[in-house]
Design a protein with these regions (language model features):
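Ordered, amphipathic secondary-structure segments that act as subunit-interaction surfaces
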Residues: 72-105
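Long, hydrophobic N-terminal alpha-helical segment
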Residues: 2-58
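Electropositive phosphate-/nucleotide-binding environments in soluble metabolic enzymes
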Residues: 15, 19, 55-59, 63, ...
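Glycine-rich, aromatic-bearing surface loops/beta-hairpins
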Residues: 92-170
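Gly/Ser/Thr-rich loops at beta-strand to alpha-helix junctions
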Residues: 39-42, 85-87, 141-142
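Structural motif
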Residues: 32-35, 50-51, 76-80, 111-113, ...
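A phosphate-binding glycine/aspartate-rich beta-alpha loop in the early core of alpha/beta enzymes
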Residues: 47-77
């Protein structure tokens, strides 16, 4: 099974507020989520949600989290983005064009999915009823810039799961 391909940005630096995340990652597994949120993302009150406030922007936090995930032998991220992000014009939100460019550079080599923002929030709310969700709230003030990381098993994939299920049906 191939390891997901992540090339850290040169902006990567340790995020002090996320030291606890390093200890938490070995406990997390497939079906858990990590969200790196913009400042206006609402506080979720589901019991399965843990929120961490960091004094940094989304992109350096993303670098740090992806680097930590890359060190884990058991999990890999599936990335989810707000579908709205691709449609925001620079004159509506200054800095969004550069943010998008830098974000997509960082995500090169990772599976990226998109859904409308409200659907992603609903997905997180549903998941948090049974599984741990870690929300890392940043100081980024650009709309629809949250990055949602759905954790998946790093040593098993959908194709192998289908083959397993097919052989069990025989």
């Amino acid at each position: 099974m191939e390891r997901w391909d992540y090339e850290p940005s040169n902006e990567w630096d340790e995020v002090e507020e996320l030291e606890d995340l390093e200890d938490l990652l070995p406990v997390l597994g497939h079906r858990n989520w990590i969200q790196i949120a913009d400042m206006a993302f609402p506080s979720l009150n589901s019991p399965g949600v843990q929120t961490i406030l960091v004094d940094d922007e989304i992109l350096p936090v993303l670098d740090f989290v992806l680097e930590l995930l890359n060190e884990q032998p058991h999990i890999r991220p599936n990335v989810w983005l707000d579908a709205e992000l691709d449609f925001i014009r620079e004159d509506w939100a200054q800095g969004i064009t550069q943010f998008r460019r830098e974000l997509y550079e960082r995500l090169r080599g990772l599976p990226v999915n998109k859904l409308p923002h409200e659907q992603l929030i609903a997905k997180l709310s549903e998941v948090s009823k049974q599984f741990q969700v870690v929300v890392i709230k940043t100081r980024t003030c650009l709309p629809y810039t949250s990055v949602f990381l759905e954790l998946d098993c790093a040593y098993w994939d959908e194709q192998r799961e289908r083959m397993l299920r097919n052989s069990m049906e025989r």
